[in-house]
Amino acid sequence: MWGPMTDLKTTAGKIEDLDAKLAESRAPLGEGEPAARTRVTQLLDEGSFVETDALARHRSTDFGREHDRPYTDGVVTGYGSIDGRRVCVFSQDGEIFDGTMGEVYAEKLTKVYDLAIKTGVPIIGIYESTGPRVQEGIVTMAGYARLMARVSQASGLIPQISVIAGNTSGIAAFAPTFADVLVVTQGTALHQAASHVAGAEPETFGGAAAHAESGTAHLVASDDKQALSLVRDVLAYLPANNRAEAPRVEAGSVADFDLNAVIPDTAAQAYDMSDVIKAVVDEGSFFELSAEAAQNILTGFAYIDGRAVGIVANQPLALAGALDSAAAEKAARFVRTCDAFNTPIVEFVDSPGFVPTPDEERAGLLRRASKFAYAQAEASVGKLTVITRKAIGPAYVFMGAKDLGADLVYAWPTAEIAVTQASQASLAIYGSEDMEEEMDELFLHPYAAAERGLADNVIEPTATRHYLVEGLRLLERKAVAQVPKKHGTV
């Protein structure tokens, strides 16, 4: 609104009028800075935020809306920097029109996405929305269609990180799940079904714990501050776009851990694969994603010799490291994320195969596991495999086999690389399990694979980091000729 003394015929008056409008846009409800804006300033480097479309307002005149036109229209958009790296950002304001999205709101989101794609920078979306603004009609749904088109276009081009900072429901709940990393804050809910339809409180079926377990959420935060800190942390492992190299930092120290003593002498005894990972990567750099989902496989980022890498590893502490449909799907998406953003992949293998149950078959194991094999074969980044113990049957194939596309495969002397377990081999060959001990000696070791070039080296566990460092240096120059095609269908 113009002040009573503002003279719009003068330059000073016009500047005063602009200042008043911008001040109103920063507190559109007249009650101080909204949480949506505070989240942006907390996320970005101090003083780096440049807002776009701050004076945008809806154009609707139905239902008396012409008298209620707050600036920003309920979403703060713009660009800035995180640790000196340029990013685009948007933050939804759950206080304006109950967090609903209208036509202008959607235009702002598509514009900031277009800006991020055009300039090749990551985009961070902070979500708090209850869905479409019903008063504006079907144009709001068209806005959601445009938004989904943009997040789809951005996928694999620029890193996308989503934060659920407030309740996000209905069709608004879909776009954040397209992100490469999704952070959900405790106490919020993300769901497409209204609570009265689902028959339960939203947090029970759409809260942080539920999404962490399902794998929808990669990270869970206790509050806004931690959520935004996690965004800054994970961004440090990602390049600006699909044309940039994975980040490099100064090489770190190595944890003091004896890898030669990690594998138990008893085959049935488990150990923690995360100990192996932490002993090989730069100290303190392993950043696990999707920790609560499919705990039989570990995924996350790390640095090795200062190079950002993706980690995929069987976890013997859960299901003895056996793969299931959830683990395959979790690993497949992570492998594709690494490949999209030029991040080498290091895999640690200790798995007896797939979980052989009717429930898994009904859960779509074959279809979901095929996604993992496809992702492994399709990935053109450097791929290194370390077989620590079991690589039995399908697990050998799916977990970074040489002929599935791994560039370098290393086996520990404790590795058991075979078609099947010794008891099953005895049964298949001799019709009984009486020859299990002989089959164990004949098949369950790494040397047959090494003789046939299926393992490049059998190495001492304590030498693992050295081999990975040198392998990563070699694979910096890796080039793969791709067969032209539109896209795969798996």
Spans of features found by a protein language model:
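Ligand-binding clefts of soluble mixed alpha/beta catalytic domains
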Residues: 1-490
